[in-house]
Amino acid sequence: MPPFARPSRVLRAVVLGDLALDVVLAPARLLERGTDVPGVVRLHQGGSAASTARWLARLGVRTTLVCAVGRDGPGRALVAALRNDGVRVRAARPAGSRTGRIGLLVDAAGERSFVADRGAADLLSSDDLRPGWFRGAGVLHLPAYSLLGSPLGGATARGIALAREAGARISVDLASAEPLLAIGRRSAHRLISDASPDLLFTNTDEAAAFLGTVDPAGLATFAPVVIVKGGAAGATLLVRGDGGPALRLEVATRPIAAADTTGAGDAFDAGFLAEWLVRDRATTLAVLHRAAAAGHRVAARQLGRPRRELRLP
């Protein structure tokens, strides 16, 4: 079964956010203080925005990634790898900066802990953006940390305005709770409200941290369609109607054993968005169910394949 319906026209998307070098540490056993343990160290293309863009391109969506990288070997290698996957990369290269690096420690269950050195990824400015990049796009997708800080937050605000002017919908993934909560829950809520997303993606842990409760129902105040990713437990969709509480839709998935879950959430977003674009961005329960099912299938593809090693020059 294909991951989503075959489009009868060109589908376009813009993703704005991080392209970074993932340095993955997968120890064969528990770390021991003051000594070394055997394991595997790998270099991969990273960044939530870049991973979503790559999957969108693989699924047949004409995709542009707007990002910033350093004027260095990792930046050149990352841009080249994404272009090889069919992504149109519009990368600013701020002087004196280095490409972002993310350290990932992967445990035996495949779960990850991160150390983020975002570097150039946070230095995209509004002057770097061009209106033509957004023309014809059906959706602008971004991880929530693209809304944070300066100059990146200003660039993202301009990107949202340009996308709206071009007729695109806005899709936001909370992506990571810690950067949002670092500014305080009230400020984080205001940031998402100001972005006014049409679609809001999150996982169960991020939703609980963002709201301060395990019940995700409150997310429906931030977007008309909310997608809560629960991993092997499936996805919960909250869909606002005409008054009254949001409708709740559960979409099951098949559990998959994975040594590394990196990128599964980004792949889900891409699968969902691709199917949603094919279905003319409709928000009926039937279309949203199809989109979530497509997201599950693409996430399974991400989990079922080894991540490709990045070759540095």
Question: Language model features by range: what are they?
Answer:
Residues 56, 203, 265:
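Short, conserved phosphate/pyrophosphate- and ester-handling motifs at nucleotide-, phospho-/glycolipid
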Residues 135-136, 196, 222:
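Alpha-helix C-terminal capping/helix-to-coil transition sites in glycosyltransferase folds
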Residues 33-35, 43, 58-142:
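Conserved N-terminal subdomain of the carbohydrate kinase-like
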Residues 139-217, 233-235, 240-241:
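Conserved beta-alpha-beta core of the PfkB/ribokinase-like small-molecule kinase fold
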Residues 2-14, 162-165, 212-313:
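Conserved phosphate-binding/catalytic region of the ribokinase-like
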Residues 1-68, 73-80, 84, 102, ...:
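Glycine-rich phosphate/adenosyl-contacting loop at the front of the ribokinase-like
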Residues 63, 89, 170-171, 226:
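Hydrophobic beta-strand scaffold residues
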Residues 13-15, 170, 200-201, 226:
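Residue-level marker for buried hydrophobic side chains located in beta-strands
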